[in-house]
Amino acid sequence: MEEPQPPRPPASMALLGSQHSGAPSAAGPPGGTSSAATAAVLSFSTVATAALGNLSDASGGGTAAAPGGGGLGGSGAAREAGAAVRRPLGPEAAPLLSHGAAVAAQALVLLLIFLLSSLGNCAVMGVIVKHRQLRTVTNAFILSLSLSDLLTALLCLPAAFLDLFTPPGGSAPAAAAGPWRGFCAASRFFSSCFGIVSTLSVALISLDRYCAIVRPPREKIGRRRALQLLAGAWLTALGFSLPWELLGAPRELAAAQSFHGCLYRTSPDPAQLGAAFSVGLVVACYLLPFLLMCFCHYHICKTVRLSDVRVRPVNTYARVLRFFSEVRTATTVLIMIVFVICCWGPYCFLVLLAAARQAQTMQAPSLLSVVAVWLTWANGAINPVIYAIRNPNISMLLGRNREEGYRTRNVDAFLPSQGPGLQARSRSRLRNRYANRLGACNRMSSSNPASGVAGDVAMWARKNPVVLFCREGPPEPVTAVTKQPKSEAGDTSL
């Protein structure tokens, strides 16, 4: 029969030893402890204490040792991870934050330009195409201007968005030299072609206003001549914008010839086309149109300042309004010319400067080049804003169909034709809105023989301000229509 073994002391008692000499020991019989047993107990106690200390350090660091690899090896990694989490952001993170804020601001500016240019020019083109009465000579030039600005927004600005999120300094790989070279040529072609068309279209609008106000009525630009001028403008833009450097021998792409450099290059390749081509491009497509704009509006302002009668005989009230509507259109075009020169002037200056210095195209574009290109894009977004400010009836023209409003020649005939949709309160508000601005005109109409219809004529002139989109002249009395020759039609700008 086996003797029952005495109960084993707790682990703490075994590690610390017995306080009495006769106490049982885990290493030997009662009555004393040997040196070997004492050494084993001390070594085990040391290892256990170290392990418990490591576990406590790992738990204080905020992470367990098991996911880091387990045991003693994972505790060091856990302490390092905890320290990394608690480490504050250093000064090296400031450039990253500032770069992100700059990219976000540039993206917002590009988005604003894109929305104004695309939506605004689409609205302008829709107004002209929707209403048959607005398909006139001046509106043909405006349609060309809006089309070029719209194509610039659709084909050039998406590449600028892509450039914002492209790592800086990236160059084209050797395997993609051919496609990359074609992309650079296409980018320059779109930007140059549509910019030239936009500038030439504004010059043609100025020429049309000059012929309408300064020259005799028989010298106005006709439809056939307008189509010829527009065709010449587009062909000139195509001729100067074609990538002629592709016809030469292909050259090695420079390391700095990046996506950013292709997009914001402000001049043709001087190594293949020469500086003379850049100078000729600026002079023929920008400086000469600028001079034509200034010449036309100088004579327009001079004619208006000297005498109204020298432009055409003013013997009816309707002709007075017609003349002032033409002057108002010329004023709007003058505002457009100021913005065109301000937006395209820096670009032309940089092109001439690069041609004079024989700057190489492999140099990265400077900040001035980027700002100059962005200003040319912004010009396409400014023009629709000018239309909307100078003509408060843009929304009315967009919402009105062809048969409404333009079939009649009289405001009083237009108002009842709207039926129950336009109540009496709306009609009175519409009349008061434009009648309050007619102080001088109404005083002049009191001496007019046709004062009975002068109010309707004045209301038509204020309700349909001749800003840009051209249409037929203001309504005249039936008796006056039979006396007036048909060749003296009114201004045809909206």
UniProtKB/Swiss-Prot annotation:
The keyword Lipid biosynthesis does not apply. It is a multi-pass membrane protein. Pfam families: 7tm_1. Residues 21-35 have a biased composition (Low complexity). The keyword Cell inner membrane does not apply. It is found in: Cell membrane; Endosome membrane. Residues 1-35, 473-494 are annotated as: Disordered. GO terms for cellular component: endosome; endosome membrane; plasma membrane. Residues 485-494 have a biased composition (Basic and acidic residues). Residues 1-12, 59-81, 147-164, 248-262 are extracellular. It comes from the Eukaryota. Residues 1-10 have a biased composition (Pro residues). Gene3D superfamilies: Rhodopsin 7-helix transmembrane proteins. InterPro entries: GPCR_Rhodpsn, GPCR_Rhodpsn_7TM. Orphan receptor. Has spontaneous activity for beta-arrestin recruitment. Shows a reciprocal regulatory interaction with the melatonin receptor MTNR1B most likely through receptor heteromerization. This is G-protein coupled receptor 135.
